[in-house]
Swiss-Prot record:
InterPro entries: Ribosomal_uS19 (IPR002222), Ribosomal_uS19_bac-type (IPR005732), Ribosomal_uS19_CS (IPR020934), Ribosomal_uS19_SF (IPR023575). GO terms for molecular function: rRNA binding; structural constituent of ribosome. It comes from the Bacteria. GO terms for cellular component: cytoplasm; small ribosomal subunit. This is Small ribosomal subunit protein uS19. GO terms for biological process: ribosomal small subunit assembly; translation.
Length: 89
C-alpha cells in the first residue's frame, strides 16, 4: 500500500535540515544518512548523499529524475554473485 496523501511524503527532518543549511551556505559536502526510507525532495537536487546499505555508505548524487523516490532505492543492500553455472571438469 502506498502512503496516505493526507499525511504527505516522509522526509527525515534531520536530513532535510542539513540540506537546507547547505543550500543557504552554498557548500557542497557529502551528507551521511541511515534514513533509507526518506523521500527525495526537490531541495536535495545537486547534493551527494551517502546512504547506508547495512555494510557501508554508498554515495548517491541526486538528480531531478530521482525526486519522489526513496533514498534506499539507489543503495542496493545485496550483491549478486551469479547463478550456479555448469561445473566443467
Amino acid at each position: 500500500m502506498s502512503r496516505s496523501l493526507k499525511k504527505g511524503p516522509y522526509i527525515n527532518l534531520k536530513l532535510e535540515k542539513k540540506v537546507l543549511a547547505m543550500n543557504e551556505s552554498g557548500k557542497k559536502a557529502v551528507i551521511k544518512t541511515w534514513a533509507r526510507a526518506s523521500m527525495i525532495s526537490p531541495d536535495f537536487v545537486g547534493h551527494t548523499i551517502a546512504v547506508h546499505n547495512g555494510n557501508k555508505f554508498i554515495p548517491v548524487f541526486v538528480t531531478e529524475n530521482m525526486v519522489g523516490h526513496k533514498l534506499g532505492e539507489f543503495s542496493p543492500t545485496r550483491t549478486f554473485r551469479g547463478h550456479a553455472g555448469n561445473k566443467k571438469k
